[in-house]
Amino acid sequence: LVNSIKLLHQGEAGRVNQAINGALDTSSIYDKYFSHEFGLTYVDNFLGTEALESLRKFLLESTIWFEQKTGGYLGAYLNDGLASPLILQIASELKSRFPLIIKDHALNQVWAYKYDSRASDPVSDVTGINIHADFAAVNINFWITQSEANLDSESGGMVVYNTEAPKDWSFDTYNNNLSRIQ
């Protein structure tokens, strides 16, 4: 059998009144971000309710998951159907709401990953994503999974390490060489 990529259905994810939560305390976010050595912070309730619900529905309904990753999760990218008016609105609002962080950097890529809950089982072949580094001037990650689906209530689902990848490492090293990363 030959794998063929065919977008069978792309859900609706149109622009909303305000994609990024209007109640966010921008000053506090800036303070936390710029007080960290590497420019790092986290924000709860990042998206507004309407944007969050629309994005969840879009990702659940759309057949845009064309890349099967090692570890048993699926990937979707802008060029393969992830692009939508809402995704582009979020990118635009990030630039206008956080100009001191985003600066003049352009959006280069957006991706989404869909995980299998079996990844939390230590004896499962489904492991999810390994420790890695993302290559970006500014990297923004957000999780849109419903809280009740989180299998570890003490965690938000993502671990961010307080370490910068060495400048002499290649993309392959900081994404695939687990023994050197650890």
PLM features: what roles do these ranges have?
Residues 1-182:
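Fe(II)/2-oxoglutarate oxygenase catalytic core
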